Curated annotation (Swiss-Prot):
The lineage of its organism: Bacteria, Pseudomonadati, Thermodesulfobacteriota, Desulfuromonadia, Geobacterales. GO terms for cellular component: cytosolic large ribosomal subunit. The gene is rplP. Coiled coil: none annotated. SUPFAM superfamilies: Ribosomal protein L16p/L10e. InterPro entries: Ribosomal_uL16 (IPR047873), Ribosomal_uL16_bact-type (IPR000114), Ribosomal_uL16_CS (IPR020798), Ribosomal_uL16_dom (IPR016180), Ribosomal_uL16_sf (IPR036920). GO terms for molecular function: rRNA binding; structural constituent of ribosome; tRNA binding. This is Large ribosomal subunit protein uL16. It holds the Pfam family Ribosomal_L16.
Length: 140
């Protein structure tokens, strides 16, 4: 699973997800992409599950780029622990996704295969998504 090698601070505040994605909102590598239409936290396990779903569908054809990285630590307290006594220890890693962010890119396959692969991947993700392609001018 994806996670940073090392971080400056072990714990982060929750933060707010306002506005649209300023960076990473256009296709950079592939011909087709999966773009977020909602904001949310995408867990490292969900990123991997979506990648596996796409890879299995396209078999050995094409290339996939993951355009998000989970760099925000989520903390949790042990079960049956009373409130207080400080913040819990880091438990998992998430990527903060805003509307417009390109999550995955793909090339080397037909549009029908890419569309279906991204549909399978989108079912694994907690945010709404849409299919975009380079030739259609990013609208689909």
């Amino acid at each position: 699973m994806l996670m940073p090698k090392r971080v400056k601070y072990r714990k982060q505040m929750k933060g707010r997800m306002t506005g649209a994605a300023m960076r990473g909102a256009t296709l950079s590598y592939g011909d087709f992409g999966l773009q977020a239409t909602e904001c949310g936290w995408v867990d490292s396990r969900q990123i991997e599950a979506a990648r596996i779903a796409m890879t299995r569908y396209i078999k050995r054809g094409g290339k996939i780029w993951i355009r998000m990285f989970p760099d925000k630590p989520l903390t949790s307290k042990p079960a049956e622990t009373r409130m207080g006594k400080g913040k819990g220890s880091p438990d998992s890693w998430v990527c903060v996704v805003k509307p417009g962010k390109v999550l995955y890119e793909m090339e080397g396959v037909s549009e029908e295969i890419a569309r279906e692969a991204f549909r399978l991947a989108a079912n694994k993700l907690p945010v709404g998504t849409k299919f975009i392609s380079r030739k259609e001018g990013y609208e689909s």
